[in-house]
């Protein structure tokens, strides 16, 4: 079977080209469809041979917050009819990468042991943008196992200033 990234690439490229006039608008509904498509029960329903593509489409359209734009409807129908619903999260990820490349920004995930308030997050985002020398779309995910501090992932770069990482470094130094 082909890799999911290989399957998703033509869909992401076509979606990107078709939505160049409104990338931000498309990003909103692509993200929503991605979230919906990650549901294992939905994927199981869609894989049922007794369920039609129209039924899957109606279910997803019904779950979506508000009405989907015409482009989103056409895109979703195409993905479902081609049996690629399970590839939708990867399509969305590749679309996001293309959108970020177009705008000169990157996604940054900040893993934190504790919740970060909006003021601190804004300051952190500004600092990270200087550190990584580009505009960042920052999101936060809680990871209590970090004990304290943060771990930032921007593309393939990782900045880890968590207590857990420091303890691991100390452990390595002591056992070396």
UniProtKB/Swiss-Prot annotation:
Q: Which domain of life is it from?
A: Bacteria
Record organism: Albidiferax ferrireducens (strain ATCC BAA-621 / DSM 15236 / T118) (Rhodoferax ferrireducens)
Q: Does the keyword NAD apply?
A: no
**Assembly and interaction partners:** F-type ATPases have 2 components, F(1) - the catalytic core - and F(0) - the membrane proton channel. F(1) has five subunits: alpha(3), beta(3), gamma(1), delta(1), epsilon(1). F(0) has three main subunits: a(1), b(2) and c(10-14). The alpha and beta chains form an alternating ring which encloses part of the gamma chain. F(1) is attached to F(0) by a central stalk formed by the gamma and epsilon chains, while a peripheral stalk is formed by the delta and b chains.
What this protein is reported to do is described as:
F(1)F(0) ATP synthase produces ATP from ADP in the presence of a proton or sodium gradient. F-type ATPases consist of two structural domains, F(1) containing the extramembraneous catalytic core and F(0) containing the membrane proton channel, linked together by a central stalk and a peripheral stalk. During catalysis, ATP synthesis in the catalytic domain of F(1) is coupled via a rotary mechanism of the central stalk subunits to proton translocation.
What is the protein named? ATP synthase subunit delta
Q: Which family does it belong to?
A: Belongs to the ATPase delta chain family.
Q: One GO CC term of this entry?
A: proton-transporting ATP synthase complex
Q: Which HAMAP family match?
A: ATP_synth_delta_bact (MF_01416)
* Subcellular location per the Swiss-Prot or TrEMBL entry: Cell inner membrane
Primary subcellular site in the record, as a coarse category: membrane
What is the topology of this protein in the membrane according to its UniProt annotation?
Peripheral membrane protein
Q: Which GO terms describe its molecular function?
A: proton-transporting ATP synthase activity, rotational mechanism
Entry-linked NCBIfam families:
ATP_synt_delta, PRK05758.2-2
User: Which keywords does this chain's UniProt record carry?
Assistant: ATP synthesis, Cell inner membrane, Cell membrane, CF(1), Hydrogen ion transport, Ion transport, Membrane, Transport
